[in-house]
């Protein structure tokens, strides 16, 4: 399956090797490292090396060219054990990336609008098609949204006159114009499940913000910093769908982002039980204060379906890939309460946790401070430099002050202290429409692109 390079002379200017399919480069004889390479005829790659050395890899006319170039790079892209993982540089060290044409399904809703803001100047993704319901089809995007634009930042003029197509009946038109789609549709679950599979079977990869496929066994539900290894299930999903390119990958529920990333680095201490109460912003319901007046001076102690998602989804995220499926973890035991509160953006979580091996407070803080995920190692465009941030102040984190930490992509924590019933308790906060929705989906798409799943 693989051709092999045993070694190469680090002092040489260039080496060329004919390749077929994938390529395994084993450079350990020179004390450099090892890594995978995926064949391409259109763009250069960088093969990440362990010993602070960059090797630029370019494929042209079925030739692999390896250059031993300068060592003045700050990051490397290869992560051992995770297959094909790339960041892209030219021989001068400038980051480059193939441009992908993307569609947004559900572009007129609040999350869809957030996608449009995030993708305006994205370095990799170019929006070429907007899709929504038949009510919006045939209208310009500006006409379809009307007075329901939910943000203070105005709609970008380059999207205003784009004509919206029907997400269900114009699928073939979408397939001709995009490399993959984001999906943020408000639709009955069984219909949405069928819609996303139909797109995948049209050979259009789907990055979904929706819940319809979160518990489909061969569909990865990914928080990019936490369980990128679940992407390994995609080939099995393609086999089931009988596709070559098409697949579905989903992000988890917005409520999870305020506590699961904070619990994840603590798994090494053996988490036994978790109790969490989430205080969720109205934008999570697609509402503003104008469209949800009943929330003013009020707290609503029920959000349909949220508690079940908050208790079950983490177990899939912490599960294992076995025989082409993701088998959910059986622990920890999680119990959740979810409340709607009069906050525009930002989900807060009060978290209580019991451990098999109780750590010290210093060990927990150290685990948070030192944790970095694959998006940080790959320097993905939407990845925050500091994924988890702890506030020492007693009155932090606060939604109004801290939801935009890391451009809304960081998860913040505070008030870590021992508890009289559980071992520890703390407060977590995440931005529900950035990290928790569109931003998390864009980051997932960046991860998929960097790993070659859209090739």
Features from the language model and the residues they span:
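N-terminal Rossmann-like NAD(P) cofactor-binding subdomain of oxidoreductases
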Residues: 88-301, 332-333, 411-412, 416, ...
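Short, Lys/Arg-enriched N-terminal segments with co-localized hydrophobic residues
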Residues: 72-96
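Intrinsic low-complexity, disordered N-terminal segments enriched in polar/charged/small residues
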Residues: 13-15
């Amino acid at each position: 399956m693989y051709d092999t390079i045993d070694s190469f002379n680090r002092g040489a200017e260039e080496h060329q090797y004919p390749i077929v399919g994938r390529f395994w480069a084993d450079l350990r004889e020179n004390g450099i490292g090892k890594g995978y390479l995926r064949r391409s005829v259109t763009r250069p790659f960088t093969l990440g090396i362990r010993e602070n050395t960059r090797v630029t890899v370019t494929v042209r006319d079925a030739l692999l060219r390896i250059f031993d170039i300068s060592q003045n790079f700050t990051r490397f892209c290869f992560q051992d054990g995770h297959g094909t993982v790339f960041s892209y540089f030219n021989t001068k060290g400038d980051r480059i990336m193939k441009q992908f044409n993307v569609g947004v399904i559900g572009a007129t809703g609040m999350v869809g609008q957030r996608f449009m803001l995030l993708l305006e100047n994205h370095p990799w993704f170019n929006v070429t098609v907007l899709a929504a319901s038949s009510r919006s089809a045939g209208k310009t995007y500006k006409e379809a949204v009307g007075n329901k634009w939910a943000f203070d930042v105005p709609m970008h003029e380059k999207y205003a006159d784009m004509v919206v197509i029907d997400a269900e009946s114009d699928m073939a038109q979408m397939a001709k114009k995009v490399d993959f789609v984001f999906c943020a549709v408000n639709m009955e679950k069984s219909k949405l499940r069928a819609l996303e599979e139909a797109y995948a079977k049209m050979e259009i990869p789907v990055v979904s913000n929706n819940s319809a496929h979160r518990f489909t066994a061969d569909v990865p539900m990914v928080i990019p910093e936490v369980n990128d290894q679940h992407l390994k299930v995609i080939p099995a999903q393609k086999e089931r769908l009988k596709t070559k390119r098409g697949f579905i990958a989903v992000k988890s529920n917005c409520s999870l982002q305020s506590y699961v990333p904070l619990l994840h680095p603590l798994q090494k201490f053996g988490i036994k039980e978790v109790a969490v109460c989430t205080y969720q912003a109205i934008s999570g319901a697609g509402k503003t204060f104008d469209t949800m007046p009943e929330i003013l001076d009020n707290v609503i102690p029920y959000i349909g379906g949220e508690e079940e998602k908050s208790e079950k989804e983490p177990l899939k995220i912490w599960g294992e890939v076995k025989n082409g499926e993701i088998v959910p973890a059986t622990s920890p035991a999680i119990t959740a309460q979810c409340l709607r509160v009069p906050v525009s953006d930002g989900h807060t979580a009060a978290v209580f946790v019991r451990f098999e091996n109780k750590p010290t407070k210093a060990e927990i803080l150290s685990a948070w401070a030192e944790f970095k995920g694959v998006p940080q190692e790959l320097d993905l465009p939407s990845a925050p430099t500091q994924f988890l941030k702890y506030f020492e102040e007693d009155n932090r984190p606060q939604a109004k002050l801290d939801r935009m930490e890391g451009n809304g992509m960081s998860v913040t924590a505070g008030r870590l202290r021992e508890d009289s019933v559980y071992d520890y308790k703390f407060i977590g906060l995440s931005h529900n429409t950035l990290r928790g929705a569109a931003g998390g989906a864009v980051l997932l798409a960046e991860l998929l692109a960097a790993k070659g799943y859209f090739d």
